């Protein structure tokens, strides 16, 4: 099982404000959906809570929610209290799927600190945003990269962005 991370960030690593996204980019949302479909998505409880009820669980993916709360339940998702336990559980599966870490900031930090992330898909949005949540600092010199997609701003996507894949 491969562990990947997927995130969209502003120029300064911004990823959110008030437990919500700070941009609307349908082309990037399509990339996220297409990339994570048929795989496992691991997210923190606040990230789960930020998804509108009508869109959760995320369709076509096995949803996993990490929380410190022992009595938390999430309809349509599996709940774990520990990232390593979740990864161990899915690693024992015979299916060859990827576990995508989809946020938020604390879960990204946990995964990066654990050293389990083998690949990252980062959407770099060419704009600065007012934010209260940021992607953890990463030493990109330790990673190889290639460009997956470049998208100019248009009537549906107000900001230009580039999706890069990083791997070790």
Set out the residue ranges of the language-model regions.
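Enzymes that bind and transform nitrogen-containing heteroaromatic metabolites
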Residues: 1-168
């Amino acid at each position: 099982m491969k562990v990947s991370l997927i995130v969209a960030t502003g120029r300064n690593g911004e990823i959110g404000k008030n437990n919500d996204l700070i941009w609307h980019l349908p082309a990037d949302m399509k990339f996220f959906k297409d990339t994570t479909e048929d795989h496992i998505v691991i997210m923190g409880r606040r990230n789960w809570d930020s998804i509108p009820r009508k869109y959760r669980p995320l369709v076509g993916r096995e949803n996993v929610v990490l929380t410190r709360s022992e009595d938390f339940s999430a309809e349509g998702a599996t709940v774990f209290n520990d990232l390593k336990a979740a990864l161990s559980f899915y690693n024992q599966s015979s299916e060859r799927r990827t576990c995508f870490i989809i946020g938020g900031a604390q879960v990204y930090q946990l995964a990066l600190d654990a050293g389990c992330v083998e690949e990252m898909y980062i959407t770099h949005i060419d704009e600065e945003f007012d934010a209260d949540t940021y992607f953890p600092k990463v030493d990109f010199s330790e990673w190889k990269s290639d460009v997956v997609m470049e998208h100019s701003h248009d009537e549906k996507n107000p900001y230009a962005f580039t999706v890069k894949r990083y791997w070790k």
